[in-house]
Amino acid sequence: MKIKILKFLKRKKWWEILVYILVVGFGFALFIGSIYDKWDKLIKWERYFILIYVSCKFVFLIWISLMYFIYN
C-alpha cells in the first residue's frame, strides 16, 4: 500500500487529481447543504437527513477509492 501511494505521488499529475477531489467534495457539500437548508422546517426528520448525509459520504469515499484504484 505504501509503495502505491509513493508511486501516485511521484506522478506528474497527482495534483490535478487532488484538485478534482477537492472540487467534487466542495460541490457535494454544497449540494447536501442546500437540501438541508430547504428542508429546515422538517426538524423531526433531522436524524434521517444525518443518516442520508453519512451514507452519501460513504458512497462518495468508496467512489473516490474506486477511481484511485482504477486509474492507478
Curated annotation (Swiss-Prot):
Primary residence: host cell
Key words of the record: Host membrane, Membrane, Transmembrane, Transmembrane helix
Places the protein is found: Host membrane
Residue ranges crossing the lipid bilayer per the database entry: 15-35, 50-70
Cellular component aspect of the GO annotation: host cell membrane; membrane
Highest taxon, organism lineage: Viruses
Protein's membrane topology: Multi-pass membrane protein
Name of the protein this chain belongs to: Uncharacterized protein ORF15
Organism whose genome encodes this protein: Spiroplasma virus SpV1-C74 (SpV1)
